[in-house]
């Protein structure tokens, strides 16, 4: 159980798809002008990557390695199609706001990368938790980016006005340049945090080794 928790939590910060692995930055930039859009896209990717990891792990021994990538993409496309149909039926407004980027989930680097590097080499349960962790990390990153951009770009969070009518919004925050700048700062913050945690881990390890000596 502890091993599964470690697999899950690495996707949150230590190997966050956006802030550490720097995968799927284009949709991260395009769909995070508001917190709702970022969160919704994150949930969609969470569902797709978790389901795809599970399916790939199940079929890994019966798929010819020479055609594995087309098979993985077909699996992803099938799951994404289901997500699109559900959103068209129950959340048409969000579906329109996400636009073509929802369909492009099929070729998101993070989904194919986890299928290739983890799910195709590990059992079903660890693959499920890997997809769940990476999906949660992706959702967390997109939601944080969306909240900050919406807060400073329109003075609201999840559509709720925070600063009042007198606030003069920084429109650059809801434009691509502002998104790039923000992502850069967040990547730097996460990098410093990970380095700090690694340093603490090494210090504990040195103390433990010293104690044994």
Curated annotation (Swiss-Prot):
UniProt EC number: 7.1.1.-
Question: What keywords would UniProt list here?
Answer: Cell membrane, Electron transport, Membrane, NAD, Translocase, Transmembrane, Transmembrane helix, Transport
| Organism name | Clostridium ljungdahlii (strain ATCC 55383 / DSM 13528 / PETC)
Name of the top EC class for this enzyme: translocase
Instruction: Give the membrane topology, semicolon-separated if more than one.
Output: Multi-pass membrane protein
**Task performed by this protein:** Part of a membrane-bound complex that couples electron transfer with translocation of ions across the membrane. Couples electron transfer from reduced ferredoxin to NAD(+) with translocation of H(+) out of the cell. Essential for energy conservation during autotrophic growth. Contributes to ATP synthesis during heterotrophic growth.
Q: For this UniProt entry, which segments traverse the membrane?
A: 11-31, 39-59, 69-89, 93-113, 128-148, 170-190
Which cellular compartments is it found in? Cell membrane
Q: Name one GO cellular component term.
A: plasma membrane
Identification of the protein by name: Proton-translocating ferredoxin:NAD(+) oxidoreductase complex subunit E
Q: Which domain of life is it from?
A: Bacteria
């Amino acid at each position: 159980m502890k091993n599964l928790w470690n697999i899950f939590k690495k996707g949150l910060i230590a190997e966050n798809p956006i802030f550490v692995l720097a995968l799927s930055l284009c949709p991260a930039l395009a769909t995070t002008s508001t917190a709702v859009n970022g969160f919704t896209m994150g949930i969609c990717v969470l569902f797709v990557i978790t389901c795809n990891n599970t399916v790939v792990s199940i079929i890994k021994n019966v798929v010819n390695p020479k055609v594995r990538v087309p098979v993985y993409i077909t699996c992803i496309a099938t799951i994404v199609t289901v997500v699109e149909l559900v959103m068209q039926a129950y959340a048409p407004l969000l579906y329109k706001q996400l636009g073509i980027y929802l369909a492009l989930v099929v070729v998101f680097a993070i989904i194919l990368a986890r299928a290739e590097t983890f799910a195709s080499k590990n059992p079903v349960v660890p693959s499920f938790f890997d997809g769940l962790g990476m999906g949660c990390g992706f959702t967390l990153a997109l939601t944080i980016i969306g909240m900050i951009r919406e807060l400073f770009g329109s003075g609201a969070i999840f559509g709720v006005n925070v600063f009042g009518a007198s606030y003069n919004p920084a429109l650059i925050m809801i434009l691509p340049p502002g998104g790039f700048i923000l992502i850069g700062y967040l990547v730097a913050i996460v990098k410093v945090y990970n380095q700090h945690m690694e340093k603490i881990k090494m210090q504990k390890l040195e103390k433990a080794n010293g104690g044994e000596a």
